[in-house]
Amino acid sequence: MTVIKTEPTTEVTLYSPPSKESLSKDDAHRKKQNNKPPSSINSRSGPNKHKLAAKAPEKKINNTDKQDLSAFLLNPSLIVKPSESKKKENIVAYNDTPGIKTEHTAFQPLTPISKKRALKEKAASEKCDSFDLSRDEKPYIQKKSKTLSSVTEINSSEYKLSLNGENTSSPAKEKSQEPIENPGSYQKTRNYLFEKPDPLDTCLQDYSSMLPSNVAEEDQEYFISVADSTLEEWTNKGQEIIDQQFQLYQEIIKKRIELSYKFKGIISVINDRADALEEQGQQLEGKIKKVKTLANEILNII
């Protein structure tokens, strides 16, 4: 029998199917080549034209990263509700560890898009709160309006009663308004307003009782005589006082005029003396100028 021996250098190669990663790389490379723009006809061929560009390192997305992203996007804490937008207008709660239910420990500022959405939801919720009333709240509001109307009626009735009570007179006033049984004899008015009253009518024996005790006797007599004077005596006395005042003014004016004439004589003497001194000064200045001119002429001659 013949035995077939294999050479030591030869190796048996087995077929192995290509991996998914290599297939995906080939597909991406083909797409890049197809998407490249065609080169211009008149372009010059450079030394580095046929060199291949270095490929950027592709980031591999693992299944775990996909799960983390899906869990982060599906996290219910990131969804802004209308009720929460009232309390937190510009903040959104987020968890440090996505995928695990924990309490809200921190807050993240809203983006411009989420701010607009939150404002829209807030306006909608306020409209709903203002216009939509439940069936249980409507009867409560009606009851409240009825109670308010009853309270206002009670207050108005109390106010009317208080006004009526104020209008009614007190018993003391009623007694004072009652007629007196024996008012006595009527006292007739015999004097005019400008006439002096009788001391007997005023229950006074003498006007001296109205004056203080510190007043001297002479002054008391004068005051009593003035009080006993009639209207004519008052007017005559006033005219006498006015005449005396006019005489005093005349005397004061005369004395001021005399003083002004005296001052005028004194002032005229002073003015004459001042004029004489000024003339003397001018004469001295003229002499000094003449001396200066003579001195300058002598210096020029020398």
Curated annotation (Swiss-Prot):
Taxonomic source organism: Saccharomyces cerevisiae (strain ATCC 204508 / S288c)
Region (Disordered): 1-67, 162-187
UniProt entry tagged with the keyword Cell wall biogenesis/degradation: yes
Keywords: Cell wall biogenesis/degradation, Nucleus
GO cellular component: condensed nuclear chromosome; nucleus; synaptonemal complex
Listed Basic and acidic residues bias regions: 56-67
Protein name: Protein ECM11
Function: May be involved in cell wall organization and biogenesis.
GO biological process: cell wall organization; homologous chromosome pairing at meiosis; homologous recombination; reciprocal meiotic recombination; replication-born double-strand break repair via sister chromatid exchange; synaptonemal complex assembly; synaptonemal complex organization
Bias kind Polar residues: ranges: 35-46, 162-171
Chief location of this protein within or outside the cell: nucleus
Entry annotated with the keyword Acyltransferase: no
